[in-house]
C-alpha cells in the first residue's frame, strides 16, 4: 500500500497532466442513458474507438429498449460483429433490454446489485454507469487501471474486484471517477502495455516497477 503523501503526489500529477472532465470515452445519447450500458457491454475485449464506430448505426437501427427486446438476434449480431464475441454480446444486449423493461420500467437502476443482475454486466460495467450516469463515486477497474495501479504500488492484487476495493480504501472518494479517466488516458499515452515510455513518465518516481527493474539497469 502507498503512503498518503505518495498518493497525493500521484493524484496531483494526474490532475496536472489530464485535467479532469466528465466526458466519457464511450459515446452515447445522454437522453438515453441505457446506451452507455450497452456500449460498455460491447467494450469488453474491444477498444472504445471500435465501439464508437459501431454504436451510431446500432442505436439508429435499434433506437429503443423495445427494439432490442423484439429484434431478431441475428440482426443484432450483424450490427456488432466487429466488436468481437458478437454472439454472446448480442444475447447480453437483448436480455438486458428485456430485464430493464420487465423489472425497472425501462430505467437504469443505480445500485450495484440490480446493475450486475443484468445480462453481461459485471462490476466494471456497473461502475461506469454509476459514475457517468448517476455521478456516484465509483472505481472502474479496466486493463489500464489494473496494470498501472499495480505498478504504482497501490495494489498487489490481480483480481479486479480486490483491486477495486484496494483503491477505494486508499484514494479519496472525490477522486475516484477522475482517477479512472486519468489512468486510462495515461495508459494510452505513456504507460502502454507493450512499450511503456518510462523515461517520459512523470509518475516514474512513484512507480515501483520503474524503481525495481529500470533504474538498477542504469548503474
What feature does the model see in each segment?
Residues 2-218:
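Catalytic cores of DNA base-excision repair glycosylases
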